[in-house]
From Swiss-Prot:
It catalyses: aldehydo-D-ribose 5-phosphate = D-ribulose 5-phosphate. The gene is rpiA. The keyword Flavoprotein does not apply. NCBIfam families: PRK00702.1 (NF001924), rpiA (TIGR00021). GO terms for molecular function: ribose-5-phosphate isomerase activity. The lineage of its organism: Bacteria, Pseudomonadati, Pseudomonadota, Gammaproteobacteria, Vibrionales. This is Ribose-5-phosphate isomerase A.
């Protein structure tokens, strides 16, 4: 089974958590794209979706799934999204697709976060994948200096502007032993919009695509 087939297995397995008549939180990325395809088979049974990115919104609308504004929804039953890394405590690094802030907002209004990944994303310690930080453009250099003080090696993601009009610093070289603490510290730096650590709001369910099919951990 290829990596993409494992992503597809995870994405389609998440469909069992979608209830009829609900509004579904939808993340961003290659694994989520498979979930959106699956969701398209239920489009007449759900009210619609809240999307974490312009890219996902376009894919949802192409399948004729109604997309609601986040501000118009009080809460969501589920949010389905991928991760760049996930540890045994279900803390995650997200933001490889630069949608981390909107992903964090949609996750915050959701009762259940369902993380869909292939087996390559599971790690013992977060940080091998560079940690994305969304930054107000005028603060880029200052934030980079502060991240160096924390032991990281921040690299400006060239040619990337987030859906919010900001920039991304990818922080290399961090072995993240205490994700919640680091999330608080980086979010406290002036000019940081958010860091791609999802530790305070980790995953509730993990669906991993494996060569044998989807493995579900609740």
């Amino acid at each position: 089974m290829t990596q993409d087939e494992m992503k597809k297995a995870a994405g389609w397995a998440a469909l069992q958590y979608v209830e009829e008549g609900s509004i579904v939180g939808v993340g961003t990325g290659s694994t989520v794209n498979h979930f959106i395809d699956a969701l398209g088979t239920m489009k007449d049974k759900i009210k619609g979706a809240v999307s974490s990115s312009i890219a996902s919104t376009e894919k949802l609308e192409a399948l004729e799934i109604k997309v609601f504004e986040c501000n118009d929804v009080f809460k969501l039953d589920i949010y389905v999204d991928g991760a760049d890394e996930i540890n045994g405590s279900r803390d995650m690094i997200k933001g490889g697709g630069a949608a981390l802030t909107r992903e964090k907002i949609v996750a915050a209004i959701s009762d259940k976060f369902i993380c869909i990944v292939d087996g390559t994303k599971a790690v013992d310690v977060l940080g091998k994948f560079p940690l994305p930080v969304e930054v107000i453009p005028m603060a880029r250099s200052y934030v980079a200096r502060e991240l160096v003080k924390l032991g990281g090696d921040p690299v400006y993601r060239e040619g990337c502007t987030t859906d919010n009009g900001n920039v991304i610093l990818d922080v290399y070289g961090m072995a993240i032993e205490n994700p919640k603490q680091l999330e608080d510290i980086i979010n406290g730096i002036a000019g940081v919009v958010t860091v791609g650590l999802f530790a305070h709001r980790g995953a509730d369910v993990v669906i991993t695509g494996t060569p044998e099919g989807a493995k579900i951990e609740e």
